[in-house]
Every structure is written in structure tokens, then in C-alpha cells.
Amino acid sequence: MEIPKLLYIAVIAIGLSGSLTCATPLANPLADPEAEAEAKATAEATAEAIAEALAEPEPGLPILALFVTIPFIHHYLMEKLG
């Protein structure tokens, strides 16, 4: 079965547009002087939120986060245990 060239072009265009959209605010801090400070504040807030979530007494939440963020480990464990 042959995949149409238009599908390849669409996938590449969507991938590039998504990566450019995500990278634009951080790509050129000279264009927006507050972009670097905003990115640093966002990174610090994210780090604090992760630290607070991991410090909670419920041990299931970090395990659930691990399974959600790294699905191949979940698949491996389910294959071995199941």
C-alpha cells in the first residue's frame, strides 16, 4: 500500500508549525525583552508544582505521573506482571 505524498507533506507541515509555535517566544528573547524572565518564572513555577506534588503523602500520585509520562514502562510492567 502506497502512502500519498500529500500525506507526508501534511505531516511535516503540521509538525513544523507546531514546533515553531512552541519555540517562537523563547527563540528570540531580543524581540520580547520580557520573554526570558517570563520563561524563567514559568520554569520555576513548574519546578515548585512538581516538588509539591512529589512531597505529598500519597505515594500513588508520583507513580501515576510516571505511568502517564512514560507509557512504555507501563506497558513493560503490565506485560511482565499481567
UniProtKB/Swiss-Prot annotation:
- Specify the superkingdom: Eukaryota
> Which body tissues produce this protein?
Expressed by the venom gland.
Q: Which residues form the signal peptide?
A: 1-23
Q: Name one GO cellular component term.
A: extracellular region
Q: Name one GO molecular function term.
A: toxin activity
Compartments annotated for it: namely: Secreted
Major localization class: secreted
The reply on keyword DNA-binding is no
Similarity section: Belongs to the formicidae venom clade 1 family.
- Quote the record's miscellaneous comment: Negative results: does not exhibit hemolytic and cytotoxic activities on HEK293 cells.
Q: What is the name listed in the Swiss-Prot or TrEMBL entry for this protein?
A: Myrmicitoxin(1)-Pm3a
Give the organism the record lists.
Pogonomyrmex maricopa (Maricopa harvester ant)
